[in-house]
Amino acid sequence: MSSLLQAIGAIPNFTDINFLFVKIYLIMRLIKGKKIQLGVVGGGPKSWIGHVHRISSRFDNQYEIVAGVFSRNSKLSKSFGQTLGILKERCYSNFREMAEREAKRKNGINVVAIMTPPSSHQIIAEKFIDKNIHVISDKPFAGNLYS
């Protein structure tokens, strides 16, 4: 039960009903004893926040980083992902490719963490949401209130 409480506490309290469904889905996955398959966009080798997020994703042993785009530079993104232990075929050149391929995989990601500058969050989040992949974004969702 403590893992369940940790999972609830680890996900911010959102008032929107859609986020409630995300919480329920992720919690049910934990109850089944399966790690949450996490994808990452951003947070590359020069990113301080990326390092922090990768460490924090291991704290409760509930997440497994299995896919990602870590740089705008395709070669750097793929090589860095492999140094993190991610399979070569799941290290992507861009977020669009990642969303498309992960959505088609039987064992695709359950959720993506966006660690890019705030002005790019909306377009990235929309792509993953369109593919029915949950999104975690800990910074402003958009660059302005209108968006």
PLM region spans:
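Intrinsic structural disorder/low-complexity segments
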Residues: 8-9, 56, 124
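Beta-loop-alpha module in the N-terminal Rossmann-like domain of NAD(P)-dependent dehydrogenases
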Residues: 90-147
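N-terminal Rossmann-like dinucleotide-binding module
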Residues: 24-86
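N-terminal amphipathic/basic-hydrophobic helices that include classical n-h-c signal peptides
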Residues: 1-27
